[in-house]
UniProtKB/Swiss-Prot annotation:
Transmembrane segments: none annotated. Gene3D superfamilies: NAD(P)-binding Rossmann-like Domain. The lineage of its organism: Eukaryota, Viridiplantae, Streptophyta, Embryophyta, Tracheophyta. It comes from Arabidopsis thaliana. Residues 1-61 form a transit peptide. The keyword Plastid applies. Belongs to the short-chain dehydrogenases/reductases (SDR) family. SDR65C subfamily. This is Tropinone reductase homolog At2g29260, chloroplastic. Signal peptide: none annotated.
Length: 322
């Protein structure tokens, strides 16, 4: 349809629409001329140059738009919960994945499971809160993927629940280094590899706590708010390199990380009461959102934070019972 319309315009140009020559591969170009009306001054004309869509961008098939075949991915913290679901989602869509975890035994078990499932997944031991280990991880990834990386999923995160005034310096440092400093540094390290891929995608795992107030989570929510703003800033800064930056912000998801707090039935009922869908989320419901943001089908989406929260973050006062 786009090609037909362009052909029609080229052969039957309406008034104020002109084609101009160009040495660019994106040609012909459209030159839209229009007049600014100013009652106090003589009218003047301006031009807007609109690059004509390339044949290759139109020719991509539907199957390719929803596939990660030929792409490489790094997922941090990929042996449990949301991280494991992300690894399996990306690998299932055809990506070659490298993941990391602190627990070597746990990592080896996961790698065995993935190998039996036919997934192309490798892994290495890494504590991403440690700067030198992050550097070693990215050296490994660069070697495995020959200097290119299409997808970076910064999944690792932790939480300490307590009133802000009770935080020790060590606890504050732990949350900041694990939740924010690690993702910031990994992005710095991954940038040359993402740029080399010509179509990079970074996805941060944020949280609804970056949008709304949650009890005893002032420090954790600060790290997630920082991630949300980093998402927006990097999306603009790295757009010139065709690297997209997005984030996914979950609410309570059924993982081992929240088992203890949700073992309190009264607390669980309160969680349900502020969640319009009235249930907890599943790791797969987060991983599918992450995968979408990595697919060619989402190639015009950047700088966005996608809430996977059953409607919690937009719920004002909408009681489940009248």
């Amino acid at each position: 349809m786009v090609l037909d319309m362009a052909s029609h315009l080229y052969t039957n140009p309406p008034q104020n629409l002109h084609f101009i020559s160009s040495s660019s591969s994106l040609k012909p170009h459209l030159c839209l001329s229009f007049k600014r009306i100013n009652p106090k001054h003589k009218s003047s004309s301006s031009s807007v140059f609109v690059p004509y869509a390339s044949q290759s961008s139109i020719a991509i098939t539907s199957k390719e738009r929803w596939s990660l075949n030929g792409m490489s991915a790094l997922v941090t913290g990929g042996t449990r919960g949301i991280g494991r679901a992300i690894v399996e989602e990306l690998a299932g869509l055809g990506a070659e994945v490298h993941t990391c975890a602190r627990n070597e035994y746990e990592l080896e078990n996961c790698l065995s499971d993935w190998n039996r499932s036919g997934f192309r997944v490798a892994g290495s031991v890494c504590d991403v809160s440690d700067r030198s280990q992050r550097e070693a991880l990215m050296e490994t990834v660069s070697s495995v993927f020959e200097g290119k990386l299409h997808i970076l999923v910064n999944n690792v995160g932790t939480n300490i629940r307590k009133p802000m005034v009770e935080f020790t310096a060590g606890e504050f440092s732990t949350l900041m280094s694990t939740n924010f400093e690690s993702v910031f540094h990994l992005c710095q390290l991954a940038y040359p590899l993402l740029r080399e891929s010509k179509a990079g995608s970074v996805v941060f795992i944020s949280s609804v706590s970056g949008f709304v107030s949650l009890k005893n989570m002032s420090v954790q929510s600060s790290t997630k708010g920082a991630i949300n703003q980093l998402t927006r800033s990097l999306a603009c800064e790295w757009a010139k390199d065709n690297i997209r930056i997005n984030a996914v912000a979950p609410w309570y998801i059924k993982t081992s990380m929240v088992e203890q707090v949700l073992s309190n039935k009264e607390y669980l009922e309160e969680v349900y009461s502020v969640t319009p869908l009235g249930r907890l989320g599943e790791p797969r419901e987060v991983s599918s959102a992450v995968a979408f943001l990595c697919l060619p089908a989402s190639s015009y989406i950047t700088g966005q934070i996608l809430c996977v929260d059953g409607g919690m973050s937009i719920n004002g006062f909408f009681p489940r019972h009248d």
